[in-house]
Amino acid sequence: MRIEAANLAGSLWICSVVNHGVQGVGVPSWVPDPELEGAVPKSSALSWTCWLLLEPRLIGALARLLVSSSIWPLSSESDFFFTATCNALTLVSPDEPHVGWIGQIQMWLKNQWPQRPGVFHCSSRCPPRRSSPSSQTLPRWWKYFDHSRFAAVVSPTPFATAHSTPRCAARVKRQTGRDWRGLAPPRRGPCFWPRFTVGVQPHSNQSRQRG
């Protein structure tokens, strides 16, 4: 599992480095500035080739990694994998950034995962109180995914929310009666959200029972 993640992350990283080079140590020069309009560069033939070769493996590997408790708490290895994945998704955009489902992912990434020094750290905000997502709360590209395959990629709401901010964790504990921060990610849940919690580590001194 970890070897597969490392190989996939390495492949994505090579694609990005070959296309755009690096700035500093391991910091891509193409990290977009959210203040600049159109900062994400247009895709090249090589980036499209990388995407077409890696896309099926990317979805499958993300699903297997997120439902596996062996990589939680998050290590630097898994953090690097997700950072490379975030960067690759923003890189491989259509020629017109707002057209197509890859463009929708790109725009959603820019809005939902604010950049930190040198890398993307995936952050999430408290979801609404409703028990299941609606068309008003999900990005428009959600309908293009095969839900039977993609449902395992995203975390159930209580787990993902509890790992975003202390305020969200407290709210989830009040609503569910459980402290989700010490639990391994459930394999299934009532409400799946397209959000990840990279860079946030669960409490290591609590039980790691499956929810």
UniProtKB/Swiss-Prot annotation:
Induction description:
Expressed during cell growth.
Which top-rank group of organisms is this from? Bacteria
Q: What is this protein called?
A: Uncharacterized protein MPN_371
